[in-house]
Each structure stands twice: as C-alpha cells, then as structure tokens.
C-alpha cells in the first residue's frame, strides 16, 4: 500500500512537521459507497446463469470503482464507522474464515482509488491510516469471536500472546522504520503502512486459531523466505533481542541483529538458496547463518568472528515471535 500512496509524489516529501496522522474530522457525507464484493468458495455452484457468467468479467472493475472523487475530497473525514460496517458485512457474508480474510482485501480495494488521489504528503499520511484501520477492525472482530468460543486454557494462552504483541508493536515499528527525526514528514505514512502489514499478519494468526476451534480448514499465507522482523520477547511485552532482514535503499539485502546484553550489529546477507542466509557484518567482524522459519520465527548462528566482535563464535540465538 505504501507504493500506491507514494506513486506520483516525487516532490513534497520534505519535513512538513506532521507527526500525527490520526486526525478524524467528520464531514457531512462519506465519499466511499457501501458496496463490497464477496468471495465465497464453499458455495460456488456449477449451475450459474449465463447472465452471471457474463457479469464475471466486470467484477474487478466494480470492486475498484466504488469511490466518488471530486475536487473537494476531504482526507480528514473519519471513515472508522464506514470501515466497521464494511467489516461486519464481510464477516456476515463470508462462508468461511479463509473467504473472510480474502474478502477483507476487497475493502482495501474499495478505498484504494481515494488514497491514490492524494496529492500532498499530508493527504498521503491521512489516507494511509485507512488501510491500517481496516485490518485493525478485522483483528478486533476476530478476537471477539475467538474470545467467545475458546476454552479457558486456549484463551489464556493466546490472550497472553496478544497482549505481548500489542505491547511490542510500537517498539518493533520504531525498530523497522526508524524515528520521526530520521524520516521527517513521511513518518506517519511509513508508520501506518508498517502497522497495516503487521496487523494483517496478526489477523491471520488469530483467524487460524479461531478456525481450529470451529473445525474449519485454514491455510496461512506464505511468509517471505528472506525478509521479516523477528524478536525474542522472553514471553513478555518487551523486545529483548531482535532480527530484521530487509532490502536496503540501494537494493542490497541487509540485516540488523540485536542480542540482549551483548550488543548489535548490522550487515548484509546472501541467500544461499537452501533456506539459509549468509550474513557478514559491515565491519567484517561477524559472520553467521540466518534461518527464516516463516510464522515460527527465525534464528541466527555465529560461525566466525574476528577482532573486537560483539558476539562469540558458535553462539546461536532464536527469535520465536514473528511479526
């Protein structure tokens, strides 16, 4: 979503001093229509009419044209109630949790044309909040249903994890995108885009737990084999150690590794193609192997050190909490 919002805005990214993009001034009428299409894989029949078949070609276009744009588009309008109504509609209209998560994407599509109309950094910051709100609303809805159906032991376990996730998400966002001072007026856009990403991921985690209770089949989406943010939180709401793998500004694959009470290092990695990433610190003092285990976290093993390295050869650290 961040790429969509940044399209066409090469200038105007200076430091406007916009720290808070959560402004929600309600205008007289919503600029987004109520229609959201649904995907229902369980109820598909082979006896669809010719008319339905012909209309299939137009499905995507109707999904993407639910927004009325005009010269006075109000980016400060509070869409929270509109989004909640859309999410409730998706929940009641989806045949399974798998379909539900797919249909939430149609709400994202519904707001995309309006977000693409943003011309200034402030408008981009404000509109980026909508997509985070969509997944945050879905996550809360999923949690409410999970809480109602889970047995006490399961609920206690997942509740502890959820509280830890909530407690850490601000810190991991800062670790991933940096501070406001580093990013200037783009900070709210970067913040909302990353919160959207990790909240969507968390929605899938809770949906998976709910599916187990309901006896539904549910397939988690594949996580990147190279990039992600993983932490060791010692079963608390604090980040003790962290591993971030991402693509740098110049296209290089970089990793930031911080180990509790030892130190941190930054460097680049090469994908060996066997599920392992070969890491070398920028100063050459640390070499090691990163293993990304998808939703189950990641690990880092130090294979070689030289000089005044912050880590010891043979040391291995696990980062079991995946964001």
Regions found by a protein language model. Name each.
Residues 8-12:
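C-terminal motif of bacterial Sec signal peptides marking the signal peptidase cleavage site
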Residues 15-112, 221-231:
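N-terminal, intrinsically disordered, polar/charged segments of Gram-positive cell-envelope systems
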Residues 96-144, 255:
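Alpha-helical segments in soluble extracytoplasmic regions
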Residues 118-133, 149-151, 181-195:
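Second-shell loop/turn segments in exported
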Residues 154-185, 189-194:
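Long, amphipathic, charge-rich alpha-helical segments that form helical bundles/coiled-coils
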Residues 217-240, 320-323:
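Tryptophan-anchored aromatic micro-motifs
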Residues 221, 265, 271-273, 304-323:
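Edge beta-strand at a domain terminus
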Residues 236-275:
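N-terminal glycine/threonine-rich, aromatic-flanked beta-hairpin/loop signature
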């Amino acid at each position: 979503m961040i790429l969509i919002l940044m399209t066409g805005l090469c200038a105007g990214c200076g430091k406007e001093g916009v720290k808070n993009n959560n402004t929600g001034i309600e205008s007289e009428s919503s600029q987004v229509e109520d229609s959201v299409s649904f995907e229902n894989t369980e109820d598909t029949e082979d006896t669809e009419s010719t008319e339905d078949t012909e209309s299939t070609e137009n499905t995507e276009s109707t999904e993407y044209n639910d927004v009325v744009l005009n010269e006075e588009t109000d980016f400060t309008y509070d869409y929270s109630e509109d989004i909640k109504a859309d999410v409730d509609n998706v929940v009641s209209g989806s045949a399974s949790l798998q379909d539900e998560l797919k249909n939430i994407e149609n709400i994202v599509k519904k707001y995309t044309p309006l977000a693409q109309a943003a011309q200034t950094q402030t408008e981009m910051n404000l509109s980026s909040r909508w997509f985070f709100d969509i997944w945050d609303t879905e996550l809360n809805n999923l949690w409410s249903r999970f809480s109602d159906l889970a047995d006490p032991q399961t609920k206690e376990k997942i509740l502890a994890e959820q509280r830890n996730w909530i407690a850490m998400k601000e810190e991991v966002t800062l670790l991933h995108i940096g501070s406001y001072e580093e990013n200037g007026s783009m900070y709210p856009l970067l913040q909302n885009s990353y919160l959207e990403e990790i909240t969507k991921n968390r929605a899938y985690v809770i949906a998976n737990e709910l599916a187990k209770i309901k006896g539904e089949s549910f397939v988690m989406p594949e996580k990147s084999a190279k990039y992600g943010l993983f932490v060791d939180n010692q079963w608390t709401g604090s980040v003790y150690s962290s591993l971030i793998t991402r693509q740098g500004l110049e296209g290089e694959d970089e990793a930031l590794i911080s180990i509790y009470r030892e130190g941190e290092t930054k460097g680049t990695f090469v994908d060996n193609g066997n599920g392992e990433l070969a890491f070398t610190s920028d100063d050459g003092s640390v070499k090691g192997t990163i293993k990304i285990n998808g939703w189950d976290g990641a690990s880092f093993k130090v294979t070689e050190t030289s000089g005044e390295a912050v880590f010891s050869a043979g040391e291995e650290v696990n980062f079991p909490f995946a964001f």
